Amino acid sequence: MTLTLADLYASPDHYLHSFDGDTAVFVPMDRAAYHRSIFLDARISPAEDGALRVPVAALIESIPASLPTGWIMHVAHCGSTLLARALDDADANLVLREPQALRQLAFGPPDGRLALTTAMLSKRYRPDLPTIVKGNVPTNFLLPRISAATPDAPMIFLYLPLREYLFAILRSDNHRTWLRNVTTQLGKHVGGAIGALHNASDAQRAAALWLAQMQLYADTAGIMVNARSLDAEMFFADPTTALTAAAAHFGVPLSPREIEARVGGALFATYSKNPAQSFGNADRLARRNDVEAELSVDLDEAERWIAARETEASSALATLRAIPLAV
């Protein structure tokens, strides 16, 4: 059977995975494949092998309007994967975690691919239930374009207060490597705040990235009327309330019994990115305490950096705290 462009835009079985130059790469998926794919980047677990390559120019000629889509935007290492997986019902709505194509757009020109990508991501198996997209740090910098295109879409900004963010981002060599890489990649967005980025310390990079994201969220909140904020510490401390509110916000049909089962089950007792590893909130807090003394110099430096920009930081946080996710 020959696929048409209409088929590609209609069925989630044809997943726009990434762009390779002027070519869009589709991989075969089904509902089970989406559910088991914790991430939809290189770690995707497709329904079968193989890929379909289609010229981007052909797809852009006839982009349909995106269907209503919910968004989880986050600062990284803050429980976003846990929240997204908790909202994912294998028999109901789709939750797309960190689509590779969307991430790529954060580093490319505004050439029509965002409309193409959001239309492809908005597909669903059940028309009566929402599709939710969980972004990543680079996709935060698409927010001006996303908000302009879909100002009515429901969105959650999952964030951490500065000190908790620093604990999460600076706690290991691997996390610091990630921080250096992503801030270098996003240099045009965060480099101006700290001058010569290649000379910046890890603490300065972390502080600059945190502030840039807080300001993006605050600016977007003024455009997207259905945007709400969620302090990740509140999510970790009371996941039942947070998950109940998130499900209601996105229109995900989770009953109180289903929510209690998820919060009390394996999902919240294992590492969200690796279900084979036991990990809960108590482990997270213990890890935080273990690194507090080790990070004291970095914490002080980052907090001084933010203190010099207190007006911007306080304004952004005040805006977010004025739109809390609530049941």
For each predicted feature, which ranges?
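Short, surface-exposed basic-aromatic patches at helix termini and helix-loop junctions that form
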Residues: 86-90, 145-156, 247-249
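Short His-Asn-centered micro-motif
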Residues: 73-76, 97-98, 133-139, 158-160, ...
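The conserved 3'-phosphoadenosine-5'-phosphosulfate
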Residues: 220-294
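Conserved beta-strand scaffold positions in the cores of enzyme catalytic domains, especially
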Residues: 95, 155, 227-229
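PAPS-dependent sulfotransferase catalytic core
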Residues: 1-120, 171, 176-203, 260-310
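PAPS-dependent sulfotransferase catalytic domain
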Residues: 112-126, 137-140, 167-170, 174-242
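Conserved phosphate-donor/acceptor-positioning beta-strand/loop module used by diverse small-molecule
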Residues: 146-172
